[in-house]
Structure formats: structure tokens, C-alpha cells
Design a protein with these regions (language model features):
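Charged, amphipathic alpha-helical linker segments immediately N-terminal to NTP-binding catalytic cores
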Residues: 1-3, 202-246
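Pre-Walker A adenine-sensing motif
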Residues: 9-23, 253-266
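Short hydrophobic/aromatic beta-strand immediately N-terminal to the Walker A/P-loop
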Residues: 29-33, 271-275
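Conserved P-loop
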Residues: 31, 35-96, 279-339
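Structural recognition of the conserved hydrophobic beta-strand(s) that form the central parallel beta-sheet
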Residues: 59, 127-129, 156-166, 304-305, ...
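Phosphate-binding/switch loop-helix module in NTP-utilizing enzymes
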Residues: 95-155, 336-395
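Long, basic/Gly/Ser/Thr-rich N-terminal segments
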Residues: 105-224
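Phosphate-binding/switch region of NTP-binding enzymes
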Residues: 163-219, 399-459
Length: 459
């Protein structure tokens, strides 16, 4: 069990562990390639951050000025300890001498800068962003010769040499460097999803070739592999934090990225539908719902759960609420046993039962309900039944959450939803996909804190 807990630390990675092992070698050459907008500059800076190379690095940019880099990546100020420097001043070269503006350099001038660093600095990290701008000004023979010379000097100086390139085809440089990382992106329902391909890492076993990542907050962070065992290893030590003067009756999920995407707050009298790919563990839904319910309790909402869902959450996850008196149950017989021979009568009985149950609560009670659609199969079968159900619960509850674990008319549930969420598995990575109100993708992983499922917007 301990090994599973340890593995959860890799749910969210700065860079892939294989790449991390490679860049910690004493000397190497690395090519980061990919079309424009894939995140090459961000990855090269993230490698600097991973190496904690604050002084002995030399970043040559043929795309942006140092001023632009510090504007685009505000965290660079703290990382390079330049927070008190004004990079707009003329003495920029002295203040942040590790960053060089080479946009107007000729190949000979740039080449001289690099070789000087290789000769004068001990074990430097040198990044050329991008090599294309330099290579395009040289003929093929000069380019091949300069690339070989750089490799020779790099080995002698025990340096780390990193190139970026927009070239999609295999270049002469790719054949002589020690490592090649290729960045790409694709679109999933109007959402861009980024990937990192470990094409070659000399001397390092590559256990996983492709990682998905986000550029949220202008950092590159990769998502680890989905392991269903992690969702069964529940953190029972940390308690739900008591928030002093926590705002009452604010409808939010508690996941900042998700709340920001849907507009800050959940719709009052709204309907959220949640489901998952069939290959995924049921524990994902249960743990996600457990996190949601704990957040609603902190906001002073009362919860009305169907029997099966309540039993699973309270027994398996020991729902960590601050007032169990605010947790109510929809009895199982309410939808199944009293009128087995008459579907219409059975459905009417269910609505009467809920209405009577709700009428017994104080007038100012703010209720959120959580229901599995599977528990309603015997009374909900047609699109009109679903429309009637959704209309009823909208009127009765501040918020309604339906767990879609039945195959009956799923499209109608989608159409009735204000927010539709689905856990999906892509390339071994777990994501939460939001299709309604607008398409978005969130990397989902386990953390050793509360809430235990973490969501990070894929940007």
C-alpha cells in the first residue's frame, strides 16, 4: 500500500520522470521540436527550473527579447532572483546576463557567443531558442559542420546544450543529439490537448513515450498515468479544513479551475450530470462526489442522497462532514416497491414521497440532491419521463446532481443538463471533460490532500 501512496506524488509532474533523469546527466545535447505554439520555449524554461540552474545558464533567444520573456513568464523574476531589477533599463545585459537577445545576430556572431560560454563557464546550461533561425542563414555544409563543432565543444566543456526547432521533418541535428523531445497538440471538441513525445533519450529507459500536459500559469506540467488502485487508497488522516467565516450558500464545486470555467458559481435550481467511461473504476465517481459533498457541507447546504449512494460514500469514504444531521436519505422503497404493477402510479408515488419529505424541512433549508439514475430505472424510461423528472427536481432543490449509471435515454439527460461532466481515459491519462455549458478538459489526479481528486485546466 505504501508504494501506491508514493506513486500518487507523480499525478502531476513538472516534466516527465524519464526526461528529468536525462537532463540531470552531466553533459548532453537535447533537441525540443514541434510546430509553432506547442510549448517549446516553456519546456526549455521548465527544464532550467527543474535543474535549478540560476547562475550557470545562457539562454539565447532568436524569437523574443529578454524583456518579453520576463513579461510572458513572470515566474522567471523569482527564479533568476531578478525581482528587484528593472529589465527595461539599458543595463539589461548586465542585470540579466544569462538571457541574450540574438534576434539580429548573424550566425557567426551567435556561434561565437556559444563557444565563448563553452570555454569560459564551468558545466554551463546553454539553450538556443531557436536553432532554425540560425541554421536558415547557413548552407547545408556549414550547418552540418557547425552542429558537429558544437557537439565536440559541448562534450569537452561537460555542458548541457538544448536546441528548439520548428522543423517537423527529421533534421541533421536530430541524428547527432543525445535526446529528442517532440511536442504536439490536437483538438478534442474544440479543446486543445497538448502532448509530449519522448522520441529519444540516450541512456535512459523510456517507460512511457507520450505524456499530456498543460501550460496553465505559464508552466509546463505533465499528467501522470491513471492507476485505479490510487482511487482506492483513501486519505483518512487529513480532515476537511474548517474555514473561518466561510460564505454560506455559495454554489461552487470547490475546484477553482472548474468553477472559473463555468462562470464562478453553479446555476441555482440547476442540474449537473456526471458519468464516466465504462473502463474506469467506479471509485472515481464516488471520490469525486465525496469531495463535492464535503464542499457543499462547508457552505452550509443540506444533502438529500439516494440510499445506495449514501451507503457507499459514508461506509467506504467515511464522509467527513461537520454535521451529520444535515445528511438525509431518499429511501429505496420510494421508487421501487409500493406500486410494482403500475409504472405511472409508481412514478407519482415517488414524487409525492419526495414532496412530503422536503415539506418536513425548515423553510430556509437549502437542499442539494444526489441521485443515481440506475435507482430510477423502474419509473423513468421515456424522454418525457426524464423531462418530467428534471423539471421536478429543479423546482424542489437548490442544485441537483444525477450520476448517469443507467443506459436509458442518455441523450435526453444530456439535453436537460446545465452542466455535463464525464471522466474519460485518453492515452493512459485521466481527464474530466466538460461538454456543457462550454467544452473544456481538466487533468484529474489524486493528491495527498483534501479534496483528494485534483483538477487542472488543460491550456
Amino acid at each position: 500500500m505504501a508504494s501506491i501512496v508514493n506513486r500518487t506524488n507523480y499525478g502531476f509532474l513538472d516534466i516527465p520522470p524519464e526526461l528529468g533523469e536525462f537532463v540531470r546527466n552531466d553533459t548532453y545535447s537535447l533537441l525540443i521540436k514541434g510546430r509553432s505554439g506547442t510549448g517549446k520555449t516553456t519546456l526549455s524554461l521548465s527544464i532550467l527550473r527543474s535543474l535549478k540552474a540560476r547562475n550557470n545558464f545562457f539562454y539565447i533567444s532568436t524569437r523574443s527579447s529578454p524583456k518579453q520573456l520576463f513579461e510572458h513568464y513572470p515566474w522567471l523574476r523569482k527564479f533568476t532572483k531578478q525581482s528587484n531589477k528593472d529589465i527595461d533599463k539599458e543595463e539589461i545585459g548586465q542585470n540579466i546576463s544569462s538571457f541574450e537577445d540574438a534576434r539580429l545576430d548573424e550566425p557567426e556572431s551567435l556561434f561565437e557567443r556559444v563557444t565563448n560560454q563553452l570555454m569560459d563557464v564551468k558545466n554551463p546550461v546553454i539553450i538556443i531558442d531557436s536553432w532554425d533561425s540560425v541554421a536558415s542563414l547557413m548552407d547545408r555544409e556549414a550547418r552540418l559542420n557547425n552542429e558537429r563543432v558544437l557537439q565536440t565543444w559541448r562534450e569537452r566543456a561537460k555542458a548541457k546544450l538544448i536546441f528548439t526547432s520548428d522543423e517537423s521533418t527529421e533534421s541533421s541535428l536530430e541524428s547527432i543529439v543525445d535526446g529528442v523531445v517532440e511536442l504536439n497538440y490536437e483538438f478534442m471538441d474544440e479543446t486543445r490537448i497538448r502532448s509530449l513525445f519522448l522520441k529519444k533519450l540516450r541512456g535512459v529507459p523510456v517507460k512511457r513515450s507520450i505524456y499530456y500536459f498543460t501550460l496553465k500559469d505559464r508552466f509546463l506540467r505533465c499528467f501522470g498515468s491513471y492507476d485505479p488502485r490510487e482511487f482506492r487508497c483513501i486519505n483518512m488522516k487529513d480532515k476537511i479544513p474548517n474555514v473561518v467565516n466561510s460564505p454560506k450558500h455559495i454554489l461552487q464545486t470547490g475546484y477553482q479551475d472548474l468553477d472559473n470555467h463555468i462562470g464562478g458559481t453553479l446555476p441555482r435550481n440547476g442540474l449537473i450530470t456526471i458519468e464516466k467511461d465504462s473502463i474506469l473504476s467506479n471509485d472515481i465517481i464516488l471520490l469525486f462526489v465525496n469531495d463535492l459533498l464535503n464542499n457543499f457541507f462547508r457552505r452550509h447546504y443540506s444533502l438529500l442522497l439516494d440510499t445506495t449512494m449514501k451507503n457507499e460514500i459514508t461506509q467506504k469514504y467515511r464522509l467527513n462532514i461537520q454535521n451529520n444531521g444535515k445528511l438525509y436519505t431518499i429511501e429505496k422503497h420510494a421508487s421501487s416497491e409500493k406500486y410494482p404493477q403500475n409504472g405511472i402510479k409508481q412514478k407519482d408515488n415517488y414524487y409525492k414521497y419526495l414532496s412530503k419529505l422536503i415539506s418536513g424541512f425548515p423553510e430556509n433549508e437549502k437542499l442539494i440532491t444526489l441521485i443515481e439514475t440506475k435507482s430510477l430505472d423502474n419509473i423513468i424510461s421515456t424522454p418525457s419521463d426524464i423531462e418530467e423528472l428534471c423539471g421536478f427536481i429543479r423546482k424542489k432543490f437548490e442544485l441537483s446532481i444525477l450520476i448517469l449509471n443507467s443506459d436509458v435515454n442518455l441523450e435526453k439527460y444530456y439535453a436537460e443538463s446545465d452542466i455535463y461532466l464525464r471522466f474519460i481515459l485518453k492515452g493512459g491519462t485521466l481527464f474530466l471533460k466538460c461538454s456543457i455549458p462550454a467544452s473544456a478538459l481538466f487533468g484529474a489526479y489524486i493528491a495527498s490532500s483534501v479534496p483528494q481528486i485534483q483538477l487542472d485546466h488543460v491550456l
